[in-house]
UniProtKB/Swiss-Prot annotation:
Family assignment from sequence similarity: Belongs to the IspF family.
GO molecular function: 2-C-methyl-D-erythritol 2,4-cyclodiphosphate synthase activity; metal ion binding
Species this chain originates from: Kosmotoga olearia (strain ATCC BAA-1733 / DSM 21960 / TBF 19.5.1)
Pathway membership: Isoprenoid biosynthesis; isopentenyl diphosphate biosynthesis via DXP pathway; isopentenyl diphosphate from 1-deoxy-D-xylulose 5-phosphate: step 4/6
The EC number(s) this enzyme carries: 4.6.1.12
Binding-site positions, a divalent metal cation: 9, 11, 44
Assembly with partners or alone: Homotrimer.
Catalytic reaction list: 4-CDP-2-C-methyl-D-erythritol 2-phosphate = 2-C-methyl-D-erythritol 2,4-cyclic diphosphate + CMP
UniProt protein name: 2-C-methyl-D-erythritol 2,4-cyclodiphosphate synthase
């Protein structure tokens, strides 16, 4: 049985020296996203896509905005979802994503992002696609991400 899920996340950006993380990779020293956790919109969208494909709720149910998750690295969210939702039950066939951001040029970071996500999920980077778009100034000081994943239920 095949399952498909879609995820979306968006965060405003602010100029500072904390740095912006997308896909677990620092992509900017000049900006950071404003969020309860580390604000990694790419991982948040992927987590929601996986949860949607498995009918397991959404990121807010699994990782609510509480003190435990304040400032938490989103890579931990993805690791938990891999262990509790995917492990032994589903195989990731494909993840496709679009990052819309005006402030940061993403192309130099795409391969590192794909490698990082592949390591966390235990899959080939060939199963992960990340497409950056500038937004043509329509999105201003923000980052928005759409992600889709296709899973196969193990044993079917």
């Amino acid at each position: 049985m095949y399952r498909v899920g879609i995820g979306f996340d968006a965060h405003p950006l602010e100029a500072n020296k904390k740095g912006l993380y997308l896909g677990g990779v620092k992509v900017s020293e000049e900006y950071s996203s404003i969020g309860h956790s580390d604000g990694d919109a790419l991982i948040h969208a992927i987590v929601d896509a996986i949860l949607g494909a498995t009918n397991a709720g959404n990121i807010g149910i699994w990782f609510p905005e509480n003190e435990e998750n304040r400032g938490r690295r989103s890579t931990e969210f993805l690791e938990i979802i891999r262990k509790k939702i995917l492990a032994g039950k589903y195989e990731i066939l494909n993840i496709d994503s679009v990052i819309i951001i005006d402030k940061v040029r993403m192309n130099p970071h795409i391969e590192n992002i794909r490698l990082k996500l592949a390591r966390i999920l235990g899959i080939s980077k060939g199963n992960i696609n990340v497409k950056p778009k500038s937004g043509n100034t329509l999105y201003g000081n923000s980052v928005s991400v759409y992600a889709v994943c296709m899973l196969k239920k193990v044993g079917t």
